[in-house]
Design a protein with these regions (language model features):
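Gly/Gly-Pro-rich "capping" loops immediately C-terminal to redox-active cysteine motifs
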Residues: 35, 42, 46, 58-88, ...
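Mature, folded catalytic cores of secreted/periplasmic enzymes
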Residues: 79, 83-87, 133-153, 164-166, ...
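N-terminal export/targeting leaders of redox proteins
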Residues: 1-39, 110, 116, 120-127, ...
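Electrostatic cytochrome c docking/interface patches
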Residues: 24-47, 129-158, 244, 248-249
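The canonical Cys-X-X-Cys-His
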Residues: 45, 49-59, 115, 119, ...
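Generic alpha-helical secondary structure signal
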Residues: 39, 43, 81, 110, ...
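Axial heme c-ligation environment in periplasmic c-type cytochrome domains
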Residues: 64-71, 89-133, 174-179, 200-226, ...
Length: 249
C-alpha cells in the first residue's frame, strides 16, 4: 500500500508540474524548429529536388531514366520561362508530369523557381557559351531563323552522317549507342525530347552534342530539324504489337 501511495503521489506531482508549465512544455513535445514543414513550406533546393525530380533525373542531376539536368549546355539552351512551363505544366503525351499546384501537382510557384534557380546556380555554366551560337531549342524557334519543317530524305542522310556510327545504320543500336528507332522509346520520347537529345546529347552517357558528332562539322538548324523528323516518322501507332495484330478477324 505504501508503494502504491508513493506512485500516486508521483503521478499527481507530474500532472501538477505539467499544468504549471503549460502544454507547450510537455516533455517529448517537439519544439517549433523540430516540427516537420508542410510540403508547401519547404524552401530548400536539395529537398524539393530530391522529392520531385531525382526519381527520374537522377539524385545529382544525372544518370537517371530521363534527361540529365546537371548539364550546362541544356541549361543554357532552355529559357527560364520555357523550363518553368515544363515543370509547372508537364509535357502531355510523355512521362513528365505537371508539378504546379495549379495543374494538380504539389509545388508552389515559389518552389518551382527555387528548383530552376538551384539548377542554374549549381549546374549552369553560362559563361562557357558566351561566344557560342546555340541552335534554336524548339522547332518553332528554328522556323524563326529560317529552318524549314524537317524533310525525311534529308533526315535519313543526316542520320547516317551524324548518328549511325553510334546508333547503327538502321537505328537498331550499335557498340556505343542504343536503338533510337525502338517503338517503345519513340512512344515515350516527344519530338521536342528527340530534338533536345540531338542538340544537347547526353553528357552523363557520353552522347555528343550537335557540335561533336562529326569533328569540324556541327549540325545546322536544318540538319537537326531533318533528323528529328526522320526519327519521329518511325513511331508506331501501337508500339510493341506485331504488324497486323488487332485487326478484324
Amino acid at each position: 500500500m505504501k508503494g502504491r501511495g508513493y506512485l500516486v503521489a508521483v503521478l499527481v506531482g507530474l500532472t501538477a508540474y505539467g499544468l504549471v508549465l503549460g502544454c507547450d512544455r510537455i516533455p517529448g513535445k517537439p519544439t517549433e524548429a523540430q516540427r516537420p514543414l508542410l510540403s508547401s513550406q519547404v524552401s530548400n533546393f536539395n529537398e524539393i529536388y530530391g522529392r520531385s525530380c531525382a526519381g527520374c533525373h537522377g539524385g545529382d542531376g544525372q544518370l537517371g531514366a530521363a534527361r540529365p539536368l546537371r548539364d550546362p549546355l541544356y541549361l543554357a539552351l532552355v529559357r527560364h520561362d520555357t523550363l518553368r512551363q515544363i515543370i509547372a505544366q508537364g509535357v502531355p503525351g510523355t512521362t513528365m508530369p505537371a508539378f504546379s499546384e495549379r495543374f494538380g501537382g504539389g509545388l508552389t510557384d515559389k518552389q518551382i523557381d527555387i528548383v530552376i534557380d538551384g539548377m542554374q546556380n549549381r549546374w549552369g555554366r553560362p559563361q562557357t557559351f558566351t561566344n557560342v551560337t546555340l541552335p534554336p531549342y524548339s522547332l518553332e524557334d528554328a522556323r524563326a531563323v529560317g529552318a524549314e519543317t524537317g524533310d525525311l530524305e534529308r533526315g535519313k542522310t543526316a542520320y547516317i552522317t551524324y548518328c549511325a556510327h553510334c546508333h547503327g545504320p538502321d537505328g537498331s543500336g550499335g557498340a556505343k549507342g542504343g536503338a533510337v528507332l525502338d517503338g517503345a522509346y519513340l512512344a515515350l520520347a516527344s519530338d521536342q525530347a528527340l530534338r533536345t537529345a540531338v542538340i544537347a546529347g547526353r553528357v552523363d552517357l557520353g552522347m555528343p552534342d550537335w557540335r561533336e558528332a562529326v569533328a569540324g562539322q556541327p549540325m545546322t538548324p536544318q540538319d537537326i530539324a531533318d533528323v528529328v523528323a526522320w526519327l519521329a516518322s518511325h513511331r508506331q501507332r501501337l508500339p510493341g504489337r506485331p504488324s497486323g495484330a488487332g485487326q478484324g478477324s
